[in-house]
Design a protein with these regions (language model features):
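Thr-Gly-centered strand-to-loop micro-motif
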Residues: 32, 39, 61, 135-137, ...
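Hydrophobic packing within well-folded, soluble alpha/beta domains
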Residues: 49, 58, 75, 97, ...
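Glycine-rich phosphate/adenosyl-contacting loop at the front of the ribokinase-like
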Residues: 1-61, 66-70, 77, 240
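Short, basic and Ser/Thr-rich N-terminal targeting/leader segments
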Residues: 52, 91-94, 216
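Conserved phosphate-binding/catalytic region of the ribokinase-like
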Residues: 1-6, 29-30, 194-303
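Ribokinase/PfkB-type carbohydrate-kinase core domain
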Residues: 1-11, 61, 72-87, 99-231, ...
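Glycine-rich phosphate-binding loop at the start of an alpha helix
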Residues: 39-44, 144, 261, 265, ...
Length: 303
């Protein structure tokens, strides 16, 4: 049966520029390539899930400007359900400028739209008939309501622990079942050693079962409630082209594998492989892999 997922949170208009190298001083810089796309953590995770074969939905606050039509066309083209998305009168959307160098590393400059700050009422029917829920912290009110409902209904719920105000993460982490932090996100939640931060997340509420922090090329550190923290090395790929969307691909793939019943280690390996493959492809989340590509890649790995 096809997995059904919903990603609740942020969508943004992405303006992506490719350059050879980042300058070391303020200057004008020629871009070798330009691409306009759609990003945002929840939006990207929905696309990643759709490409893996899930029946994916996105639900997040959007404004009334022209970017909304771009968002809806993007989701429609990539098979993501947006039936619950309604533009908010008088509000604006988020926009990001993403600059990627020849090594695949990137800088992101973002402006948060007013729709995230004044999202209107949350529609609880968006969680009906879902198998797994993802939430990001950009619209705290909606993330909180989505995760509370998921817990009440016994739905697996994954929080994207991206860097955010500490108060927001401290409000949301205890509502998650699994939480996947970026390194800066974990430091915002609990400054100090990674292992202490993961332990703090697990201690925040008995319902939190797994906490993980992704560390780029160094892999990740993860911990299941009642067990010691463990390291998982990152997968090596021949050439990194674009890391934009790799974290969101990881989150979508982690939710996909988890909801399908894989063990925590199996789900983390699947997600790590998906993120590694995404890094070999350009154009942000459009480079997220299909399920058969991830499984073929994993079959070539020794461990």
């Amino acid at each position: 049966m096809t997995l059904r997922s919903i990603s609740v949170g942020h969508v943004a208009l992405d303006l992506m520029f490719q350059i050879d190298a980042f300058p070391d001083h303020p200057t004008k810089k020629h871009a070798d390539a330009f691409f306009q796309g759609v990003g945002g953590m929840a939006a990207n995770s929905a696309v990643a899930l759709s490409r893996l074969g899930a029946k994916a939905a996105f639900y997040g606050p959007v404004g009334e400007d022209t970017a909304t039509s771009t968002f809806l066309q993007h989701f429609r083209r990539l098979g993501v359900d947006t039936r619950h998305v309604t533009p908010l009168h008088g509000q604006t959307n988020s926009i990001s400028a993403i600059v990627t160098d020849a090594s695949g590393e990137r800088m992101i400059y973002s402006h948060k739209g007013s729709a995230l700050q004044q999202p209107g009422p949350f529609d609880p029917t968006c969680l009906e008939h879902q198998d797994v829920v993802l939430a990001d912290p950009r619209c705290v009110i909606w993330a909180e309501q989505a995760m509370k409902l998921a817990r009440q209904r016994g739905l697996p719920c994954l929080l994207d622990g991206e860097v955010s105000p500490a108060a927001d993460l401290q409000r949301l982490v205890p509502l998650s079942q699994w939480v996947a932090f970026s390194d800066p996100g974990l430091q915002a939640f609990h400054p100090g050693p990674h292992a202490d931060g993961l332990a703090s997340a697990l201690d925040s509420d008995p319902g939190v079962e797994l906490a993980v922090v992704t560390l780029g090329g160094e892999g990740l550190l993860w911990q299941v409630r009642g067990q010691a923290a463990q390291r998982l090395a990152g997968f090596k790929v021949p050439h990194v082209v674009d890391t934009t969307g790799a974290g969101d691909t990881f989150h979508g793939a982690l939710a996909f594998a988890w909801a399908q019943g894989q063990s925590p280690l199996g789900a983390l390996r699947f997600a790590s492989a998906a993120a590694a493959l995404k890094c070999t492809r350009p154009h942000g989340i459009l480079g997220a892999p299909h399920q058969d590509e991830v499984r073929s890649f994993l079959a070539t790995q020794l461990v």
